[in-house]
Amino acid sequence: MSNKKKVILGMSGGVDSSVCAYLLLKQGYEVEGLFMRNWDSMLNNDFLGNENISQDICPQEQDYQDALEVANKLGIKLHRVDFVNEYWNDVFKTFISEYEAGRTPNPDILCNKYIKFKAFSDYAFNNLGADYIAMGHYAKVTDGRLYRAKDQNKDQTYFLAQLSHEQLKRVLMPLAEFSSKEEVRKIAQEQDLITASKKDSTGICFIGERKFTKFLQNYIPMQPGDIVDIRTNKKLGKHEGCFYYTIGQRKGLNLGGQAEPYYVCGHDVKKNILYVAPSSDLSYLTSDALLATGLTLNHDDFDHNNLSAKFRYRQQDIPVTIELLPNNTIKVYYPSESQAVTPGQQVVLYEGQKCLGGAVIEKIYYKGSEKTYL
């Protein structure tokens, strides 16, 4: 009987997880792949905005075929599991209810917390006898603690910050030390893997590319209302539904005849009003503090005087100070100010290379006053 440690690898049919399979084999693990099916367009009424609905083979099925071909090439077993119900209940219902409340959720964060590192890991450990699970994320995990990847451009710790130390204790991230995606593709080419030049997946986690406003209309009916200048309270036009617009958005407002472009600065969901402000006045987007809830901290030990944060993916870190409050609540102060910090999104805290954790943004402040129009 083999004394090799068994790793169950999330295989998506993309180049990252394909190369992970090769690397883990090379490192001496017993490797098996697990492909997740998390979305069913027919069952989930996903018709509007879905350009794949009439294709002979849906992208998800093509991904499975690619993962299978890679698994066969590397001589490993590929399992397939269906988490459509879990995704709907734990990720998508929250996603929709947040939009209905006029907030901007991040499905990738929910997806990692409840699917990849909960449903997937439970299945791998309980059904497939895994010692470890592995994922093709660009992030570093050491002893269950989360750190930034070497490739800062691809670093995905922002999406993993809600994971607990417990969830990460038996996780391997083989791509942590790569300097660029090109290095990963080069290995795939050298090993003649079918996914070597496959494009990165984009769009909503496990759902894919959609025409977003149309896609939301499958689940949230259109509710046209007034677009109002927040400074003058003057009606400037009509919107299709508050839920379809995000804070800071400039395109798609159809406000012709104005002296300058406008941007979305807030909404009143109950009154169905979309608030806008002119581009020359960014004060309505600016904030210097926030309150966030549901804080998960992955590191216990950190220097309170050397913290930075991101409020959205790929944003440059900005220096912050924090105030830890009861009930996993946190106040974050950023005196250098930031724009378009949005309720429903996540604040992620860092100390150098350490990703300390994250929380969901609830309230935004500027010069001591809450911005209630968000």
Curated annotation (Swiss-Prot):
Signal peptide stretch: none
Annotated NCBIfam families: PRK00143.1 (NF001138), trmU (TIGR00420)
Location relative to the cell: Cytoplasm
Disulfide bonds: 111-205
MF annotations from Gene Ontology: ATP binding; tRNA binding; tRNA-uridine 2-sulfurtransferase activity
Chain positions covered by the region annotation Interaction with tRNA: 154-156, 312-313
One of the protein's GO biological processes: tRNA wobble position uridine thiolation
Main location: cytoplasm
Binding site for ATP: 10-17, 36, 136
UniProt family annotation: Belongs to the MnmA/TRMU family.
Known EC number: 2.8.1.13
Catalytic residues (UniProt): 111, 205
Function per UniProt: Catalyzes the 2-thiolation of uridine at the wobble position (U34) of tRNA, leading to the formation of s(2)U34.
Site (Interaction with tRNA) residue list: 137, 345
Originating gene: mnmA
Keywords associated with the record: ATP-binding, Cytoplasm, Disulfide bond, Nucleotide-binding, RNA-binding, Transferase, tRNA processing, tRNA-binding
UniProt GO cellular component terms: cytoplasm
HAMAP family hit by this protein: tRNA_thiouridyl_MnmA
Top-rank EC class of the record's enzyme: transferase
InterPro entries listed in its UniProt record: MnmA-like (IPR004506), MnmA-like_C (IPR046885), MnmA-like_central (IPR046884), MnmA-like_central_sf (IPR023382), Rossmann-like_a/b/a_fold (IPR014729)
Protein name as annotated: tRNA-specific 2-thiouridylase MnmA
Region (Interaction with target base in tRNA): 106-108
Source organism of the structure: Mycoplasmopsis agalactiae (strain NCTC 10123 / CIP 59.7 / PG2)
